[in-house]
Design a protein with these regions (language model features):
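Active-site neighborhood of glycoside hydrolase catalytic domains
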Residues: 163-233
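N-terminal carbohydrate-binding accessory modules
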Residues: 31-86
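Disordered, acidic Ser/Thr/Pro-rich linker "stalks" and the adjacent N-terminal cap
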Residues: 395-399, 562, 628-662, 673-753, ...
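Aromatic-lined ligand-binding clefts that engage carbohydrates, nucleic acids, or primary amines
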Residues: 426-440, 469, 539-562, 569-570, ...
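Aromatic-lined substrate-binding rim segments of carbohydrate-active enzymes
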Residues: 72-138, 210-215
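Short beta-strand-plus-loop segments that form exposed binding edges in beta-rich domains
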Residues: 471-476, 594-600, 668-675, 761
Length: 785
């Protein structure tokens, strides 16, 4: 229509207004095949360009699956009010494809709606579709059913894996492709894979994933992300590179520039805090350092994404596990600027004030939306119970016990049952346990098999007659990072009694899904104190609101409120509460169901106005870490290497003059770069005879002379979890023991080692090791003090 040819000016205005409205409408939502493009986004020589103008991406990560759908708009409004102009979002493949070929894009999995709300709230979107995500999510978002192929190689060009990936990403393109900026939507970039440099070096695999996204209809700029030291592994030179780090942007961007001389600088994961794992201290970020590094990036025209801007909660059974085995809490608060419950923290307002100094032309910051109502309620008793052993399905008969995947089960628990003969006290041993095995004789618990310590055997008491042996296996989420991701769950055969293989098993599937919960037979009879059981109760509310369920009187398990699984709990902490969103509660009668595998002190529950995220109770743990006070007898004949590390934060690779063979590896710190009495290690990898990193599967910390657990999580296990943003740190809170410091790893089996990689602490410099000695030996020789 030529406006100039219309004689009636009012009509011309009406037609022009309608035409502009058509251009700015997201027609893809209404089913129109091609939506008009109203904006452009490109990657320039120095800057990101939005409609041809410099655009500094101020992004923050929020995962739709970790926020109730009813609260998506509120959290996105909070992100906008903090000063973000973009939100970054992972997709979790296993959430969207729970069974092969069955896709879910509704409810909590409606990521398209999340993106549409982001657009309505004035936010752009960076999409991270996978297929691998990490994110402390079950198996890094990879579907468990792939593990039904015993020999499948994940994150490789294995045809079975790639076929499944291509099917999934095609669905992602169908669902989210119309929401790209090139089609009138908010998605400005899409990520190829995720931190692949930590995992492999196959550029062919990365090319396959890139081409699959292109074939799925993604036509926005694609990019990949890695920490700078891993970036060149599998790096595609025709893809934009973004760096992940938690501190020191100047140094890390300098590393990025060596690999990518041109283009804007971007930190794709910048950490304001960290996630929590069961049994370790709650993490708090260094806010002053966070703000200082953030301002450096703002002042130097660098873009960034705060991971996490809002962490939320890993509801359901979706929480993952750090390597080699450190299960994550359901709370994903992350010490983020927006708290788990969506509150504006002091860090939120400090971040907002900082962003206000660097707004782009025409930008203003809206006021934060009001917080959701908070309620508390008095303790109520759960008066009904359903013992696990009295609510079993039909058994599967098998000669030897298999893992859960063998029986087509992905989540929940599994009970393995057999008969054993009368006899004297004797040893029960399994090949491995994934993850916790509660062992019962005739219904009475006699011990726990514990993957954390590689405890795969225990002493059974004397039996005057043949007895029923039950092993109730509880998985805690599959490993979500590193080569240990193919984390099959359950009892790993063979199972031996006094060295003889036990045969003839009944296997009971306990998936903890809606169907199973609906079939439970509750009674008013209380079970034995430590028998595994479901508990049920109701409580009345005058009005709904967010609350935190106090679980300090309970043991270990999972809980549901009005049919919604709130996640896992464990009395050892640090989390002692479960976030119950008000949108899942209602005025009047509410129902709660709690599975307790250990047995509660009292079957009562109360609602609190504030969470408890930082209360460790190690005395309640059924396993005490094996780090006894001792003096080491390190024989010089066991020494594989000695030398000095270079100062700074760069990864350093040490090659032994001669490969050494043993089951134990010891790194001894003789002094520190800064002369202080501390030692710290961000990450240790051991190298095989071919110079490749040895899998951490089965590794445990055999001994550490000192670790800080009061003021921060400086646990020794941090040195082998694959994460360079956290670290082992010797004690500094209530004491500061001096050098030498020793960390000994039990590798689970004898290995031939040709060297090791050492990653120094990446943030402040305290504890960076200067002079060291490395030992490899077959027997741990400790002399008790």
């Amino acid at each position: 229509v030529k406006i100039s040819t219309i004689s009636n000016p009012r009509l011309a205005v009406v037609i022009l207004t309608a035409f502009v409205a058509f251009l700015t409408t997201d027609h893809s939502r209404a089913g129109v095949g091609v939506a008009a493009t109203t904006h452009t986004f490109t990657i320039g020589t120095n800057d990101f360009l939005l409609d041809g103008n410099r655009f500094q991406i101020r992004c923050g990560e929020i995962h739709a699956a970790r926020v109730p759908k009813e609260y998506w708009r509120h959290r996105l409004q909070m992100a906008k009010a903090m000063g973000l102009n973009t939100v970054c979002a992972y997709l979790f493949w296993n959430l969207h494809e729970p069974k092969p070929g069955e896709f879910v894009w509704t409810g909590q999995a409606d990521d398209a709606e999340f993106c549409r709300i982001a657009k309505e709230e004035g936010l752009w979107v960076i999409l991270r579709p996978g297929p691998y995500a990490c994110a402390e999510w079950e198996m890094g978002g990879t579907p468990w059913w792939l593990l039904k192929h015993d020999d499948i190689q994940l994150r490789t060009r294995d045809p079975r894996y790639l076929k499944a990936v291509k099917s999934y990403l095609k669905e992602v393109g169908r669902e989210l492709g119309p929401l790209q900026i090139t089609h009138g939507g908010p998605i400005i970039m899409a990520q190829v894979e995720n931190e692949y440099g930590f995992f492999g070096k196959d550029t062919g695999y990365m090319t396959d994933i890139k081409n699959t996204l292109l074939d799925a209809g993604f036509d926005v700029p694609l990019f990949e992300c890695n920490p700078p030291d891993q970036m060149q592994n599998g790096m595609l030179t025709n893809l934009f590179q973004a760096a992940n780090f938690g501190s020191d942007p100047e140094h890390n961007f300098a590393k990025l520039r060596k690999l990518q001389p041109a283009g804007p600088l971007m930190c794709s994961e910048f950490y304001p805090g960290w996630f929590d794992t069961w049994g370790q201290p709650h993490h708090l970020g260094n806010t002053a350092k966070y703000l200082s590094d953030l301002e450096y990036m703002l002042a130097h025209d660098a873009s960034f994404s705060i991971y996490m801007a809002h962490g939320g909660t890993t509801f359901g059974l979706w929480s993952g596990c750090d390597r080699p085995f450190k299960p994550d809490t359901s709370s994903y608060d992350y010490d983020a600027p927006i708290s788990e419950a969506g509150w504006a923290t002091p860090k939120f307002f400090q971040t907002r004030a900082l962003f206000a100094k660097y707004l782009l032309p025409g930008e203003t910051l809206p006021a934060p939306p009001p917080p959701n109502p908070i309620i508390a309620f008095a303790p109520v008793e759960l008066t009904e119970s359903a013992p696990v052993f009295e609510n079993l399905p039909t058994a599967i008969k098998d000669s030897l016990p298999g893992n859960m995947e063998t029986y087509d089960q992905g989540y929940g628990c599994m009970l393995y049952r057999t008969k054993i003969p009368a006899g004297a006290a004797t040893t029960l041993q399994v090949a491995a346990i994934h993850d916790f095995g509660y062992v019962y004789l005739n219904g009475k618990r006699v011990g726990v098999l514990d993957r954390r310590s590689a405890t795969a055997k225990l002493l059974l008491p004397e039996r005057a007659a043949p007895a029923r042996l039950d092993i109730l296996v509880e998985p805690m989420g599959r490993v979500n990072f590193g080569p240990e991701m193919a984390d099959r769950k359950g009892l790993i055969a063979p199972v031996k009694l006094n060295g003889e293989v036990l045969k003839g098993w009944d296997i009971f599937k306990l998936p903890l899904d809606d169907k199973m919960l609906a079939g439970l037979k509750f009674t008013g009879v209380k079970p034995d104190t430590n028998a595994p059981a479901f508990w049920r109760g109701t409580f009345q509310l005058e009005h709904a609101g967010d609350t935190f369920l106090d679980l300090r009187g309970w043991g270990k398990g999972d809980l549901w409120i009005n049919g919604h699984c709130l996640g896992r709990y464990w009395n050892i902490g640090p989390s002692q509460t479960a976030f119950a969103p008000g949108c899942w509660l209602h005025r009047g009668l509410n129902q709660i169901v709690i599975l307790d595998l250990l047995g509660p002190q009292q079957p009562k529950i109360a609602g609190m106005e504030k969470p408890i995220l930082d209360q460790l109770r190690p005395a309640l743990d059924f396993h005490v870490q094996n780090h006894p006070p001792a003096k080491l007898n390190l024989d010089s004949s066991m020494m594989a290497d000695s030398g000095s590390f270079a100062p700074g934060t760069d990864t350093q690779e040490i090659k032994f003059a001669t490969p050494a063979t043993g089951k134990y590896f010891c790194l001894e710190s003789l002094n520190a770069q800064d002369g202080q009495p501390y030692a710290a290690v961000a990450e240790l990898d051991l190298l095989d005879v071919n110079g490749q990193a040895i899998s951490h599967d089965g590794w445990t910390v055999a001994y550490v002379d000192s670790e800080e657990l009061e003021k921060e999580d400086g646990s020794a296990a941090n040195a082998i979890d694959g994460q360079t943003a956290n670290y082992w740190h010797t004690q500094w809170g209530s004491a500061s023991p001096g050098h030498p410091h020793q960390l000994i790893l039990n590798l689970g089996k004898t290995q031939t080692i040709s060297g090791f990689r050492y990653v120094p602490r990446q943030s402040e410099g305290a504890g960076r090791i200067k002079d060291y000695r490395a030992f490899v030996f077959t027997k741990l020789d400790l002399l008790t003090k």
